[in-house]
Regions:
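Right-handed parallel beta-helix/beta-solenoid
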Residues: 28-45
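N-terminal basic/disordered segments at the start of proteins
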Residues: 6-29
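A structural signal for the main folded, soluble domain(s) of proteins
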Residues: 10-12, 35-38, 48-54, 121
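Conserved small/polar residues in nucleotide/adenosyl-binding loops
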Residues: 135-137
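Short, low-complexity cationic-aromatic patches
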Residues: 25-29, 61-72, 107-112
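Short, charged, solvent-exposed linker or helix-capping segments at domain edges/interfaces
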Residues: 126-132
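Short, conserved loop-to-beta-strand elements that form functional interface hotspots
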Residues: 8, 12, 73-121
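Short, well-ordered amphipathic alpha-helical segments that serve as non-catalytic structural scaffolds
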Residues: 17-18, 45-65
Length: 137
């Protein structure tokens, strides 16, 4: 593993959520991070799992020193039943700061109803907003 790449796994027990993240760059250059949020399959209904994922997302972004200050470029939600889950997700997303969002109907392999992949960077780039500004289903 390169000295410019770091992989971590963090468990948030009270949310029954695991976050895996890889950090790239540093030392004066642009930093990038890929975060993957998983919720335990038995963590309740879709709405409860969505709430747990969003709380974990905010907790990690505000508390992890190496991620703090980074800007989300895009979020990709993996849903088990996008047609029936989209409305609840859309209601949550309208209340939060925007970044490009995509939704994929691909059930998470662990059997949960939702998973989230987030790409962050330390230096926002206007090109990202231009190319990644639409919500895709």
């Amino acid at each position: 593993m390169s000295k410019n790449m770091e992989y971590r796994k963090h468990r948030i027990e009270y949310l029954r959520t695991t976050v895996e993240y890889s950090l790239f760059g540093g030392e004066g250059g642009t930093r990038e991070a890929h975060l993957m949020f998983h919720v335990d399959p038995e963590a309740g209904s879709y709405e409860e799992q969505l709430t747990a994922i969003r709380k974990a997302y905010h907790r990690i972004l505000s508390r992890k020193v190496k991620i703090r200050g980074m800007v989300p470029v895009f979020c990709r939600y993996f849903l088990s039943d996008a047609a029936n889950q989209w409305e609840a997700l859309q209601a949550v997303l309208q209340k939060e700061p925007s970044c490009a969002v995509s939704v994929v109907q691909q059930p998470p392999l662990d059997g949960s109803k939702i998973a989230l992949w987030v790409y962050l960077t330390s230096e926002p780039n206007a090109a990202y907003k231009h190319y990644l500004s639409l919500i895709h289903i």
